[in-house]
């Protein structure tokens, strides 16, 4: 089936994967579009890019995802979204700060084309946080269909993190 041929995405965190939220849960005003990885009650864990691609969107807001990075993976036909971030990697942060000064505003929503901010599988793109509308430190992660924008169940791409005999 198509399900069996899905790519395995790189682990976003180098800590044992524990979920605090699942895909499709009914929240107060929306369906949960991704999965939430617990971060041991702390912020500041390195977040690793799931696959080769490019940063396609950066969000900074006092609510919602707070700080978020969207990475487009053209070869996989996917977009991965990393939310509630404490901070961005230096190459991403430089762009964010310049834009905040230019616009004289904290809130930004910037989109980028392929080639502008390339990222590699496993590259550190941010630090985990508790920003935006977050009830405690965690990493929110979406996997979306590049063509339709539909939210996909991330567990289909991260099964290997949960059902293996590797313990760290």
For the regions a protein language model found, what residue spans apply to each?
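Surface-exposed, glycine-biased beta-strand/turn segments
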Residues: 2-79, 86-91, 105-108, 112-115, ...
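A solvent-exposed, charged loop/short amphipathic helix patch at secondary-structure junctions
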Residues: 96-107
């Amino acid at each position: 089936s198509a399900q069996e041929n899905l790519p395995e995405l790189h682990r976003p965190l180098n800590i044992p994967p524990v979920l605090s939220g699942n895909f499709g849960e009914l929240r107060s005003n929306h369906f949960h579009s991704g999965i939430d990885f617990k971060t041991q009650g702390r912020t500041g864990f390195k977040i690793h890019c799931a696959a080769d691609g490019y940063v396609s969107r950066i969000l900074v807001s006092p609510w919602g995802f707070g700080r978020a990075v969207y990475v487009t993976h053209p070869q996989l036909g996917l977009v991965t979204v990393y939310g509630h971030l404490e901070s961005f990697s230096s190459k991403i942060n430089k762009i964010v700060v310049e834009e905040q000064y230019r616009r004289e505003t904290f809130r930004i929503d910037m989109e980028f084309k392929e080639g502008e901010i390339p990222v590699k599988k496993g590259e550190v793109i941010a630090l985990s946080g508790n920003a935006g509308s977050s009830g405690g430190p965690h990493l929110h992660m979406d996997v979306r269909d590049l063509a339709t924008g539909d939210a996909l169940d991330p567990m289909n791409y991260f099964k290997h993190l949960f059902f293996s005999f590797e313990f760290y």
